[in-house]
Amino acid sequence: MSYPTRAVRAVRLLSLLLCATTLTTACPLPAHALAEHTKSSSAGNNLTTNMDASHASSSSYTSRLALYHSIEALTGVPWYRLAAIDQYERTLTVAHPKDRKHAERIIGIFVTGPVWSGLLNPDAEDQNPRSIELFSGLGQDGSGDGIADRNNDKDLLFSIASYLGKYGNNEDEFGIAVWEYYHNSRSVQRVQQFAKLYQRYGKLDLVSQAFPLPLGSIYSYRSTWGSRRSWGGYRIHEGTDLFAGYGVPVRSTCYGVVEMKGWNPFGGWRIGIRDLNNRYHYYAHLSGFDKTVHNGDIVTPGQTVGWVGSSGYGKPGTQGKFPPHLHYGIYRDNGWTDWSFDPYPLLRQWEQSERKALKSGKTKGTSS
């Protein structure tokens, strides 16, 4: 039996390396791809966290915005797209804090060592830009110090921007770049929604909140999340019922993008709005919608999106199977699915904050 010479073995090894490197370049893994995702109901109950946009300080917003603009100047990638990816990554860390631990910094983007340095790189913590490039890693030196550090804000954001820039700058090309990074259509939708909000308002602190019903109207509510429901099969109640008369305005609780609008057999006429904390706000049993609000539209805190009714529990148009009320639900996206959690504490908080603001002569929404 003959054995290959050292030269032959070296050529074979080099061929395998080049092949694997090509595959890695064609399909970069998402920043969280190496983390194990588990579907636990407790993930959806993570109601408040310091990573939420609503808890960020004004100085943090200023620092982040300045960094986005500086990287835009270097790469040509619009700042609001960088902001959108950064914010989306923050929401993933909220959902998976144990899997996405990183040093405290301005930017919330999380990249694993192997993705940063290259999957075939023997040094998962490599910071040499040349060897990282050799192994098709994501990491680059954005600060000019000759080091590609995945915990350096400039290096991290410059690397993401450089990756995006390879695909082009129009909306479709941006969507393709995000898809190739995450391989998840939900991620593409979320990032594009966030970018749309940031582009519209030109700022990051879009954290104002409003109570879903006018405080001057007659209404009542209590915590009903988790109670049993039987229509259509036994299930738990994923929301809070706010009882009010027919036609009472239903208002957006947040800055967000309309994600869903139409009929649902359970919720009747309903509308769903996605906010920058990656929470889905669900308004159901409406008597109708504001006709100026459409799927994909941006809404603001306190904006009327519909009116209280009693629709649902049947085919389109079914009304009156229960007293008129607003079913308000809230869900958190963990990157793969939405998890319901009890909205009652937030409703109480928004109601009280808005009352205090009205008493002090302020009419705008308040931060949650």
Q: What are these regions, as identified by a protein language model?
A:
Residues 2-5, 10-70:
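N-terminal export signals and maturation junctions of secreted/periplasmic proteins
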Residues 50-201:
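Catalytic glycan-binding domains that act on GlcNAc-containing polysaccharides
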Residues 193-269, 301, 358-368:
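Surface-exposed, glycine-biased beta-strand/turn segments
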Residues 209, 321-368:
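Acidic, glycine-rich catalytic/binding loops that coordinate metals and/or anionic ligands
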Residues 232, 308-325:
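Active-site loop architecture of trypsin-fold serine endopeptidases
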Residues 240-242, 270-276, 329:
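Short, acidic/hydrophobic/Gly-rich beta-strand patch recurrent on exposed beta strands
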Residues 253-295, 316-319, 323-324:
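Zn2+-dependent peptidoglycan hydrolase active-site motif and core
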